[in-house]
Amino acid sequence: MPKKDSRSDSSKVMMKKLNSFILLFLISSCGGDGGMSEIPQNYSPIINLSSSLDEQLITKSISLNWTTQNVNSCSASGDWTGEKSLSGSADVQILKVGANTFTLNCNGDNGSISVSKNIIGYVVQRKIIQQSIGGALQDREFFIRYPLNPSDSSYPLVFFFHGAGGNGEGELNRHQAVINLIDEGNFIGIFPSGYQNKWNVNNETAADDVDFFESIINDISSNTIFNLDKVYGVGISNGSGIVNKIGKETFTFKGIAPLISQQTVDIGNIIPEGVLSVFQVNGDNDNLVPVNGGIGVANTNFMSASGSAENWALNFGCSMSPEEETLQWGSKTVNAFTFSGCLQNNEVKYFIVQDSGHTIQFGQDIDLFIQIWNFFKSREN
């Protein structure tokens, strides 16, 4: 008799066990009607929350948009409140400087979820423009200071140009009287930074700062909060030089206030593009910018203070016989001269502060920036 193959018997036993296991699995998986039951799945709640902007001027609005999955109800918390639809959009107001947090909380059968969006509110905005200087692109910065409670109106613009060695942010933080005027809603302040902390008036740098100024105007021109028909410029020392240069080479400024610097001889030779009003201030003991003209700081050849004002007046068709008066600015006596009767209701003023050097500090009884702003307003056509 042939020998029985034990391996064959073993295989048969294994197959029987496997078939029994499969049958048991199928039986346990069947529903009452004989069909296969669904295997339970965990559908977790999902929120997609987005915003139209990541930063916004305070009191202005942004749009929030959201969609959800696997949720039954939603509500808002943080800097917005109330029940929310499962998908939708909402305009929300930015009410404070810094982070404004908008949180959406949703509940579903398989749990809860919360998603937040932070929107930065600001009154100071730092912006960058690229400019070609010496064949290479350079970042040029400027700061915009808005009122604390901006309205929907368009605001006049006042540019403030720092002196040599300064920057826009420093100038913004230096004059509390300017901030007060801005927060009262009189105007929006723009504080540019000079390339290498200087303005190119007499070849101080390779930058074209008139072009930089025009680039700023172009950059902000689409925003209706800026009234580009009322643009003014204030400059201190080296900043006065660029204010005079912009005033001569463009027609954007409606008024300028060059402080402790008059026109250079080269700028004086330029025929102005437009007509504007001038509020010029000099100290009679200025050792950097000589009041009587000549070579001064950075080997710059200045006109005299009176000659600079007369140059403006002559170009603007003013009466060339100025009115004279004596004023008191704090502890300082001031000789004031006014050329009136200029084209388009403009006026040219210059002030010589006695016993004063290269400074605009004349004591606490006088606020120069309030005087300048009142002068600008008085010349509006």
Model-found features: residue ranges?
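C-terminal catalytic histidine-bearing segment of alpha/beta-hydrolase fold enzymes
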Residues: 277-281, 303, 313-381
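Serine-hydrolase catalytic machinery in alpha/beta-hydrolase-like enzymes
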Residues: 133-146, 152-232, 241-245, 362-366
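Solvent-exposed segments in extracellular or luminal domains encompassing
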Residues: 84-101
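Proline-enriched interdomain boundary motifs that mark the N-terminal boundary
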Residues: 42-51
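A domain-start/cap signature at the N-terminus of enzymes
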Residues: 35-40, 88, 118-157, 205, ...
